[in-house]
C-alpha cells in the first residue's frame, strides 16, 4: 500500500481548528517571528523530525512544518530551551518503553512561553512559562500548538536552563527521595551514576535536607575534577566503582550510617554492590540501566537483610497522578524553592542551535559526558 506523502498529511492535519490530538501534538509544531508582534502572520515552524528508528544523529532531520490554528482549548507556545536526555536517545533508537507514531518530533522535556491562548483556556495566559506534563509532546522545535491541559506553569524568576531541565531528572530525584523511605537529616543514600542529571539532582536535594550521599562514579581521566564538582554540589562522599568493592568501605561507614536507600541507574554488578551496603530493611530503587545488564539480587540480601527491590519511572508517576494537579504542583513548587535558594542548579549545559543537531546528538552519545546538550530557540 502506498503511504501518503508528509506534505499531504500536513495539509489534512492542519485543516482542523479543534483540539490537537495526541498524534498531531507529536508530529507538528509552530514558530513565531523574532519580534513576536504578530502571531497571525506566522505560517510554519522548524522542528527536528524522525521517520524511522536508528542512530540518533542519522535518523533526525531539520524540517519546516506548517502551523495549525489555535483551537479553543489549545495554546500556541514558543519553545525557549529543550535538552537531550538519555530517554530521548532511546526513543530515537526505538528501544524506549513508549514510542510515538512516526513521523515524530524528538524531545520530551523543555520550557516554552505561551504566546496565544484559545477561547476556552482558563488555566494559562500569554507570557506564562510552561513545561509538558507528560512525555511524547516533541520539544525539539521552535514552537507548537498544544492542549492547555497538557502543560503546567513554572515561575519566570528561575533560570531558563533550570526550567528546561526540571521536568525529568529533578522530578525523578525528588520522588525517589520521597516515596520509598522516610528519610530524615543524618540518614544516608547511596547511588551510582552520580554524575548523571538524576544523580546531580539527588546530591543537591539530599544536601538541602541534611541527608548524606555516597556517590559512585566510573573511573575516568577527569576523575578529580568531577569529584570536586560533585562535592561542591553537596556530595558527602564520591567514590569509584572499584572503591565500592574494597574493604575500605568499612572506614567510610564510620563517618555516616549505612544507607537506607540505594538508587540504581546502571544495573549489573554496580547494582549488586549497592545492595551489599544497604542497611537491613533498606530499599534499592532502579530508575535506569546504562550498563544494559540485569539487576542480580543475592538471596542473602533478601533473607537476612529483608531488602526491598523497586523500580521507578517518572513518566508513569505523572500518568498515575494525571488528575492530581496538586501533587505535581507541590513537587514543582518545592523544587523551584530550592532553585531560588541556590540549592538546586541545572547540570552543566552546552547550548546549541537546532541546526547544529547532529553534533549535539553525537556529543550526547559519547561516554564520560558530564555536560548536557540543550537546544535553545
From Swiss-Prot:
On assembly, the entry states:
Homodimer.
For this UniProt entry, the molecular function terms from Gene Ontology, in alphabetical order, are: enoyl-[acyl-carrier-protein] reductase (NADPH) activity
Q: Which UniProt keywords apply?
A: Fatty acid biosynthesis, Fatty acid metabolism, Lipid biosynthesis, Lipid metabolism, Mitochondrion, NADP, Oxidoreductase, Transit peptide
Identify the enzyme class. oxidoreductase
What positions constitute the catalytic site? 96
Gene3D superfamilies to which the protein is assigned, alphabetical: Medium-chain alcohol dehydrogenases, catalytic domain, NAD(P)-binding Rossmann-like Domain
Residues reported to bind NADP(+): 169, 195-198, 218-220, 287-290, 312-314, 372
The protein in question is named Enoyl-[acyl-carrier-protein] reductase, mitochondrial
Primary subcellular site in the record, as a coarse category: mitochondrion
Stored InterPro entries: ADH-like_C, ADH-like_N, GroES-like_sf, Mito_Enoyl-ACP_Reductase, NAD(P)-bd_dom_sf, PKS_ER
Amino acid at each position: 500500500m502506498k503511504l501518503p506523502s508528509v506534505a499531504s498529511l500536513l495539509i489534512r492535519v492542519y485543516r482542523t481548528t479543534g483540539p490537537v490530538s495526541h498524534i498531531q501534538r507529536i508530529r507538528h509544531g509552530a514558530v513565531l517571528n523574532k519580534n513576536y508582534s504578530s502571531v497571525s502572520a506566522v505560517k510554519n515552524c522548524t522542528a527536528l523530525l524522525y521517520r524511522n528508528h536508528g542512530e540518533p544523529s542519522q535518523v533526525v532531520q531539520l524540517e519546516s512544518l506548517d502551523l495549525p490554528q489555535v483551537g479553543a482549548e489549545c495554546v500556541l507556545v514558543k519553545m525557549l530551551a529543550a535538552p537531550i536526555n538519555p530517554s530521548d536517545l532511546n526513543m530515537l533508537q526505538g528501544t524506549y518503553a513508549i514510542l510515538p507514531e512516526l513521523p515524530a518530533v524528538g524531545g520530551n522535556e523543555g520550557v516554552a512561553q505561551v504566546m496565544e491562548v484559545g477561547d476556552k483556556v482558563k488555566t494559562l495566559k500569554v507570557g506564562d512559562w510552561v513545561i509538558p506534563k507528560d512525555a511524547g509532546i516533541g520539544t525539539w522545535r521552535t514552537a507548537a500548538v498544544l492542549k492547555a491541559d497538557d502543560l503546567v506553569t513554572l515561575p519566570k524568576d528561575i533560570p531558563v536552563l533550570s526550567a528546561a531541565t526540571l521536568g525529568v531528572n529533578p522530578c525523578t530525584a525528588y520522588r525517589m527521595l520521597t516515596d520509598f523511605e522516610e528519610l530524615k537529616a543524618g540518614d544516608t543514600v547511596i547511588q551510582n551514576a552520580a554524575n548523571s542529571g538524576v544523580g546531580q539532582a539527588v546530591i543537591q536535594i539530599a544536601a538541602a535536607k541534611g541527608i548524606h550521599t555516597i556517590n559512585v562514579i566510573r573511573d575516568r581521566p577527569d576523575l578529580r575534577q568531577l569529584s570536586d564538582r560533585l562535592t561542591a554540589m553537596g556530595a558527602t562522599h564520591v567514590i569509584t566503582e572499584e572503591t565500592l568493592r574494597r574493604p575500605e568501605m568499612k572506614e567510610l561507614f564510620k563517618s555516616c550510617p549505612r544507607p537506607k536507600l540505594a538508587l540504581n541507574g546502571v544495573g549489573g554488578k554496580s547494582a549488586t554492590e549497592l545492595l551489599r551496603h544497604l542497611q537491613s530493611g533498606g530499599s534499592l530503587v532502579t530508575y535506569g540501566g546504562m550498563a544494559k545488564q540485569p539487576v542480580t539480587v543475592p538471596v542473602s540480601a533478601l533473607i537476612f537483610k529483608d531488602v526491598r527491590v523497586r523500580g521507578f519511572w517518572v513518566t508513569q508517576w505523572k500518568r498515575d497522578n494525571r488528575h492530581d494537579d496538586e501533587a505535581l504542583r507541590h513537587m514543582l513548587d518545592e523544587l523551584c524553592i530550592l532553585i531560588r535558594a541556590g540549592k538546586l542548579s541545572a547540570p552543566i549545559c552546552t547550548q546549541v542551535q537546532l541546526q547544529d543537531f547532529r553534533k549535539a546528538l553525537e556529543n550526547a552519545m559519547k561516554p564520560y559526558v558530564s555536560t548536557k546538550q540543550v537546544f535553545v530557540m
